[in-house]
Amino acid sequence: MKRLIMIAMALSAMLLQSTGGFSQTVKNVNLTQHLQPYGFFRTSAIFDSRDSKAGSEDLFYYLPLDKSINLNGADVNYNPSFKMSAITTRLGLNVTGFRYGDFSVSGKLEADFYLMVGSTASLRLREAYVDLLWDDYSSTLFSIRAGQAWHPMSADLPYCINVETGSPFNPFNWSPQVMAGITFGNWTLTAGAIYPMQFLPTGPSGPSENYVKYGLIPEIYAGVSFRTDVFLARVGADFISLKPRWRSEEILAGSYDVGTKTGDRISMVSPMAYLQFTSGAFKMNAKTVLAQGGDHLRLMGGYVLTNIDDPLNYQYLPLVSSSSFVSFSYGRRFQIMGMAGYMRALGTNHMINLGDASYVNPDNIYYFSDGFKNINQMFRATPTLAYNLGKLTFGIEYDCTGVEYGDINSLDNHCLAIKDRHIILNHRVMGVLKYNL
């Protein structure tokens, strides 16, 4: 027994000595957790002058529906409407306090009630990520973000009070990702891999993550930012590679059974540029995206099937579009805001061989599920007034969104609706009461 006690004492002494030596090499260890809850209660009242395409409870607004004339000559989509909702109420938690030498860890968990299950609002995950930061390399910072967070193409938002925050003129997406950044001086380089979850690319089976899952290539983003006290400039690009078919769903050419592996693939790149200026109570920003596809970013786009001669290797072309916005905000207690957005469909970069057909078959186009294949261009203006009384905000916003539609059955060899062009307008008025926690 005495021998065991002596051995234990010797081991304890060795551990204490090694721990003391180790503590001399580590500058600081801090395991204190700091939890900072945040969020807001938000109630919205909305008037629309006509039926429109919008997300849950008509809060996330996209565009007015095209005219649909009945036998009496009336437009059945001309239906003014009014509604109220509070499902965008949000809860979040910031976690900080873990530091180990020059290495620190923080995190975020955020959710809202913007998920309708029948007529019941349910909790929906928005963000859940961990940030790893190394900050003791002279003026250079290195960071890694892992988890679900804002897509880098979407992170810079226009100044407005609506739920869609500029979409579909501004990308809107948060997804699981691993994003690395390195900052030296005023410059930051960012790159990483992204996987679609809530905001999905489209294809023959509708919106699905499977086009990336079975394609074995993650979505990739890379960008560079320059920041000063009053100015921010950012350029970046999103790359996504899809397999519209990874196996056959039917017997092909009489020789290939159901489940035969296919070589289909389409890869698309969407570059982006962003500018922001801040001076006192005045803020202004602008963004433009030249999107190939872009439907997973809630932009009006997709791609088209162009050739099926090889039953195991269908050919596709991306639909190109240009989407931009400019916005401003002035004031603190009494705040004036405004956004102007414009989108133009540019079609395919190459002409499609139509063969004996006169126009492209719309069934061969895989398009954003909340848009329409015969859109030529869109525009939006949203003047906004807000009064901020401490944590309480009263806001009212007017939204005028216009869409130029064309004949869906007259798509040319670039997939553009060239006939019967006409503009449809919707006038939306939104009132918001918001209380920040």
Spans of model-derived segments:
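C-terminal segment of classical bacterial N-terminal signal peptides
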Residues: 13-22
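Outer-membrane beta-barrel "beta-signal"
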Residues: 421-437
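Extracellular loop and loop/strand-boundary signature of outer-membrane beta-barrel proteins
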Residues: 76-79, 114-116, 161-166, 202-210, ...
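Outer-membrane beta-barrel proteins
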Residues: 48-52, 118-121, 155-158, 198-203, ...
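Positively charged n-region of N-terminal signal peptides that target proteins for export
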Residues: 1-4
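Transmembrane beta-barrel architecture of outer-membrane proteins
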Residues: 34, 85-90, 124-127, 173-177, ...
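Detector for outer-membrane/organellar transmembrane beta-barrel domains
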Residues: 227-375, 379
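Outer membrane beta-barrel
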Residues: 26-57, 68-69, 74-199, 214-217, ...
